[in-house]
């Protein structure tokens, strides 16, 4: 789907459209079924039918927009049929893959570790933003939803633009600059919080701008590091390592709140996770290949 010269744009466009498409659906559901009572087609909140129908429409939306993947996207055929393995043999294969990466491509393994950390920090930004907005800045539920919509729209557009910058400069440069900007924005939210809600609107959205570009650039950067012929395996490890450290941001947030005494201190916990991930990223040496562009 991409060449080395267009990998950033393709990844950024795909990830950015995911943000924008999700917001379009969310807006339809909020305007059509969640906020009004009754909503479209006379659906009411009695028995939570508006929520039920929203879930059904979400499933239909997913199915419809998944169809092009099955019918229009070319796929590189597998070299050979993979044998069916049991649960425990799958774990053995996982550790065998990690051991093989240590010997064959240490930089790929280092990046998997770094990205797992900062991606959990990114998840923490969206997970706890609503909590901080409500408890520390007095946002009501409607304002939190409006902020979330604005954050996703901005991040979607920024992700598409970030892909272009990635092709012009480098994926690692985009990730590093974005992480620096996010940490800066979060610290400013913490420091300037006494000035009022405009601080969260301004610097919270500033941080949200850079979430998508990091996610997109992380994916395309990994594609350039993967040893030829191991694309599916390594992207599987990419997903696995991300889930393996998914406790980091919640733990850091909880610890910071416990130490500081208010939810506002949780921002520093999330910023710390992002900072650690960025430091680990800086230790990864760039040795890209073009294995995914065959």
Identify the residue ranges that each predicted region occupies:
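Helix-to-loop junctions at the C-terminal end of transmembrane segments
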Residues: 157-171, 257
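Glycine-rich segments within core transmembrane alpha-helices of 12-TM secondary carriers
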Residues: 11-33, 239-249
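Multi-pass alpha-helical transporter architecture, strongest
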Residues: 61-72, 268-294
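C-terminal ends and interior cores of transmembrane alpha-helices
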Residues: 180-194
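Short amphipathic helix-loop junctions that connect adjacent transmembrane helices
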Residues: 127-144
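A membrane-interface helix-boundary motif in multi-pass transporters
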Residues: 31-60, 255-274
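Intracellular juxtamembrane helix-capping segments at the cytosolic ends
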Residues: 1-2, 213-226
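Juxtamembrane intracellular "pre-TM" segments in multi-pass secondary transporters
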Residues: 74-112
């Amino acid at each position: 789907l991409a060449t080395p010269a267009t990998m950033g744009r393709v990844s950024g466009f795909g990830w950015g459209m995911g943000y924008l498409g999700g917001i379009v659906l969310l807006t339809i559901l909020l305007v059509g079924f969640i906020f009004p009572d009754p909503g479209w087609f006379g659906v009411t909140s009695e028995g939570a039918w508006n929520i039920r129908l929203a879930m059904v429409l979400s499933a239909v939306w997913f199915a419809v927009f998944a169809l092009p993947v099955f019918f229009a996207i070319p796929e590189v055929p597998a070299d050979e049929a993979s044998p069916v393995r049991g649960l425990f043999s799958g774990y053995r294969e996982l550790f065998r893959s990690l051991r093989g990466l240590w010997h064959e491509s240490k930089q790929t393994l280092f990046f998997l570790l770094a990205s797992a950390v900062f991606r959990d920090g990114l998840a923490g930004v969206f997970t706890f933003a609503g909590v901080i907005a409500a408890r520390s800045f007095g946002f009501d539920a409607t304002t939190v939803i409006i902020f979330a919509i604005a954050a996703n729209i901005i991040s979607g557009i920024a992700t598409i633009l970030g892909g272009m910058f990635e092709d012009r400069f480098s994926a690692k440069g985009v990730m590093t600059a974005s992480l620096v900007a996010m940490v800066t924005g979060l610290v400013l939210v913490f420091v300037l919080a006494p000035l009022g809600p405009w601080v969260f609107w301004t610097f919270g959205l500033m941080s949200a701008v850079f979430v998508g570009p990091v996610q997109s650039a992380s994916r395309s950067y990994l594609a350039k590091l993967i040893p030829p012929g191991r694309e599916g395996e390594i992207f599987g490890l990419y997903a696995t390592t991300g889930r393996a450290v998914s406790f980091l941001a919640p733990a850091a947030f909880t610890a910071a709140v416990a130490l500081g005494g208010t939810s506002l201190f949780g921002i520093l916990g999330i910023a710390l996770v992002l900072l650690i991930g960025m430091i680990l990223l800086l230790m990864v040496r760039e040795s890209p290949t073009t294995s995914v562009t065959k």
